[in-house]
Amino acid sequence: MIETYSQTAPRSVAPGPPVSMKIFMYLLTVFLITQMIGSALFAVYLHRRLDKIEDERNLYEDFVFMKTLQKCNKGEGALSLLNCEEIKSRFEAFLKEIMLNKETKKEKNVAMQKGDQDPRVAAHVISEASSSTASVLQWAPKGYYTISSNLVTLENGKQLAVKRQGLYYIYAQVTFCSNREASSQAPFIASLCLHSPSGSERVLLRAANARSSSKPCGQQSIHLGGVFELHPGASVFVNVTDPSQVSHGTGFTSFGLLKL
């Protein structure tokens, strides 16, 4: 008895792509990338070259125009009088445009230089005796000093008003008799105040000095000073608790400002 055994054949494995195909795809990819880079570089070169050719063409046209104008002036060539007049008028219009642009640029530069040169603004006033019992000090119109009178003014003899925004150094010196009879024993207080364009008022600086019982009158001074930003229409003034104690001699009490 003969027994036969059937053996199953192994599954066939699909062969992968050959090595030559991989090399071909790699070279094709490199070629395409190189071609794209080369095309981009060529486009840039062509654009620059066209710009250069355009500039050269414009220069050539200008050269031809100048040669034609020279021939018109010398009466050379076969150009008619009408053509020469047209060329001359074009040239004159071109010169006028250049001169106009030059003058405009010059005026702009001068205006910018004038704008950069900020005018100096300063004022200094001295006190004036007043019979008024108001706490705001009065300042004498004589002895009123200012560098730019149109940008700072003394209003009502009390306030220094500015017309230009900026940083200002504001100062005040108030001299008072410390042992003169007063209604109270409270310290003498001097305040530097701001009156804003909106109408509100606030204290910028304040200083106090105690009274003295010594005789004769003991002169004491209070000094105030600081840098503040002022807006157009703003004004500053000096306020004291007892104006009857203030000394109004030469150089005793003064007030001023300086734009920085």
From Swiss-Prot:
The keyword Ribonucleoprotein does not apply. One of its GO terms (biological process) is platelet activation. Residues 47-260 are extracellular. Residues 121-260 form the THD domain. The record marks 111-112 as: Cleavage. InterPro entries: CD40L, TNF_CS, TNF_dom, Tumour_necrosis_fac-like_dom. Keywords: Cell membrane, Cytokine, Disulfide bond, Glycoprotein, Membrane, Secreted, Signal-anchor, Transmembrane, Transmembrane helix. Glycans are attached at residue 239. CDD domains: TNF (cd00184). It is found in: Cell membrane; Cell surface. The soluble form derives from the membrane form by proteolytic processing. Pfam families: TNF. SUPFAM superfamilies: TNF-like. GO terms for molecular function: CD40 receptor binding; cytokine activity; integrin binding; protein serine/threonine kinase activator activity; tumor necrosis factor receptor binding. Its main location: membrane. The chain crosses the membrane at residues 23-46. GO terms for cellular component: cell surface; external side of plasma membrane; extracellular space; Golgi apparatus. It is a single-pass type II membrane protein. Disulfide bonds join 177-217. Residues 1-22 are cytoplasmic. Cytokine that acts as a ligand to CD40/TNFRSF5. Costimulates T-cell proliferation and cytokine production. Its cross-linking on T-cells generates a costimulatory signal which enhances the production of IL4 and IL10 in conjunction with the TCR/CD3 ligation and CD28 costimulation. Induces the activation of NF-kappa-B. Induces the activation of kinases MAPK8 and PAK2 in T-cells. Mediates B-cell proliferation in the absence of co-stimulus as well as IgE production in the presence of IL4. Involved in immunoglobulin class switching. PANTHER family: CD40 LIGAND (PTHR11471:SF5), TUMOR NECROSIS FACTOR FAMILY MEMBER (PTHR11471). Belongs to the tumor necrosis factor family. Homotrimer. Interacts with CD28. CD40 ligand, soluble form: Exists as either a monomer or a homotrimer. Forms a ternary complex between CD40 and integrins for CD40-CD40LG signaling. This is CD40 ligand. It comes from Felis catus (Cat). The gene is CD40LG.
